[in-house]
Regions:
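Short, solvent-exposed loop/beta-turn-alpha elements that line the ligand-binding surface or hinge
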Residues: 55-57, 138-161, 235-236, 253-276, ...
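Hinge/lid segment of periplasmic solute-binding proteins
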Residues: 51-54, 125-189, 334-336
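Conserved C-terminal helix/tail region of periplasmic/extracytoplasmic solute-binding proteins
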Residues: 11, 56, 201, 223, ...
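Extracytoplasmic/periplasmic substrate-binding proteins
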Residues: 77-78, 242-253, 276-373
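C-terminal lobe and pocket-closing loops
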Residues: 75, 142-146, 151, 155, ...
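N-terminal secretory signal peptides
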Residues: 1-21, 25, 44
Length: 479
């Protein structure tokens, strides 16, 4: 590497020039893609190592437990960079999601030392953390001797930092006093509306402005467009049916899952606000949803949007992102920061967060922390967002990155605007408590019964609240 080449890449690593200018100047120097990538990694390693000893755990080997996911793919693709920068070897096991969480629970509950770092959803930490299975990452984040000065914890979106931290006391606010940082945010999903621009335009329709408008348009499409229906949402007997579009709308209409008045949890999903919203939700499904809604998971919702079978979905925005390329409807997908309640001022999307957590049983915690810093750091997440599919990025600096904006505007028009409109109100709206999966699965089952007409909305939500109160009491969570 010549001095001119080294200076060029060091200037980029110091953020004195942008990626586009770097690539243009590298090309003028006659550097190919492989050489450019190698020199860029070397420059970034030099910049990161300037004020922090990344080689302190040289010679150690880490083992990761990963879900099969684009976030994991982005890290694996660039893993050689981490190994060269730290001298730490990394091995990993990857499992599909239908068995992944069973693998995590088995490893942690047995206090296995097999894995040092693993992927986790934020909701799962409500079980893993209080059980003593996770490291509270505050001990690393708040210790300048353990954390690189360039890491910039504050750059991670504040709602994500708080949504992955909790005191462990049922009902206490996420990110509140005494909260432990159980995971590092790694990527997330905003539950919003994605829509088929071509299908709506053919009916002379604009994207829906609120839930009543969505219901009307979904009903019209289900009636007028052969082989298509209006709105796709999840409906299987699973916690995931509640956490996506349903809870986002439920919150926007003023609903809450629990009250914490008096320091005790009380189920209140059967409030007037909760009942009124749920009636609208079921009206939407009956008039404009899929005929076999009770079988719908992430996959059916996603596939129908990409196949042109559904006109709209109210689910993770990254579904719309992934369906925009390589599908029948590629190029036809639009995105909207959706405010369901006509009287609400802004969206309140519930979110799913994939994070990285450290096993409390790892004997290589300092090395594990170096990996977690690298994997959730600005450079790697920018790589994931611009060169792979690590969206939605958890760092504001990545959303501000010129190359990422160019990528979005070129192939995913409207996605950046959807994020900017929804992100301020995007967070986890569930009340943290250890029976989360029991509660939400029972809630989904109750929705199915209401949908089928086996019970009214009023009675169904009242029965659900009574049942959950009993479960909390039996578990010793309430008196």
């Amino acid at each position: 590497m010549s001095n001119k080449e080294k200076s060029l890449f060091d200037a980029f690593a110091a953020r004195h020039l942008g990626r586009r200018e770097l690539l243009d100047r590298a090309a003028k120097l006659g550097l190919g893609a492989a050489a450019t990538s190698a020199m860029l990694n070397a420059a970034q390693s030099r910049a990161m190592a300037a004020d922090y000893d990344w080689m302190a755990n040289k010679g150690q080997t880490l083992r990761l437990l990963l879900n099969k996911h684009p976030y994991a793919d982005a890290a694996i693709t660039n893993l050689k960079h981490f190994e060269e920068m730290t001298g730490i070897k990394v091995s990993y096991d990857v499992f599909p999601e239908d068995v992944y969480f069973d693998k995590v629970t088995a490893a942690l509950s047995s206090k296995s030392t097999q894995y040092d770092v693993f992927m986790t959803g934020a909701y799962q930490t409500w079980q893993y953390g209080p059980a003593g299975w996770l490291v509270d990452l505050n001990q690393f984040i708040k210790d300048p001797s353990k954390t690189a000065p360039t890491y910039d914890w504050e750059d991670i979106l504040p709602n994500l930092r708080s949504s992955t931290s909790w005191s462990g006391k049922p009902g206490e606010a996420l990110g509140g006093p005494g909260a432990k940082q159980w995971a590092m945010p790694w990527g997330f999903e905003i539950n919003d509306v994605s829509f088929n621009k071509k299908m709506l335009a053919a009916q002379g329709m604009e994207p829906p402005k609120n839930l009543p408008d969505l219901i009307d348009k979904a009903a019209q499409i289900s009636t007028k467009v052969p082989g298509a229906y209006g709105i796709g949402v999840r409906g299987s007997r699973s916690w995931a049916t509640i956490h996506a579009g349903y809870l986002s709308g439920f919150t926007n209409y003023g609903g809450k899952d629990f009250s914490t008045e008096g320091g005790s949890l009380k189920p209140i999903m059967n409030s007037k606000e909760g009942k009124d919203f749920t009636k609208l939700w079921l009206d939407m499904l009956h008039k404009g949803g899929p005929k076999n809604w009770t079988q719908y998971t992430w996959y059916e919702v996603a596939n129908d949007l990409g196949a042109g079978t559904s006109a709209m979905i109210y689910d993770a925005d990254i579904i719309g992102f992934f369906q925009q390329t390589g599908t029948k409807e590629a190029g036809n997908i639009g995105y909207e920061a959706f405010t369901p309640n006509p009287d609400a001022k802004a969206p309140t999307p519930n979110i799913w967060i994939w994070g990285l957590a450290m096993s409390a049983f790892s004997g290589k915690q300092d090395a594990a922390w170096r990996f977690m810093q690298w994997a959730s750091g600005t450079e790697q997440l920018t790589f994931g967002a611009t060169k792979a599919n690590q969206v939605d990025p958890v760092r504001q600096s990545v959303w501000n990155d010129g190359d990422f904006k160019t990528r979005l505007n070129a192939t995913y028009p409207g996605f950046l605007e959807e994020f900017n409109g929804a992100a301020p109100g995007a967070k986890i709206y569930f009340t943290p408590q250890p029976l989360f999966f029991n509660v939400t699965t029972d809630w989904a089952a109750a929705l199915q019964k209401m949908y089928a007409g086996q019970v009214s909305v009023d009675d169904g939500l009242d029965q659900l609240a009574t049942n959950i109160a009993s479960q909390l009491s039996d578990a010793g969570i309430t008196n």
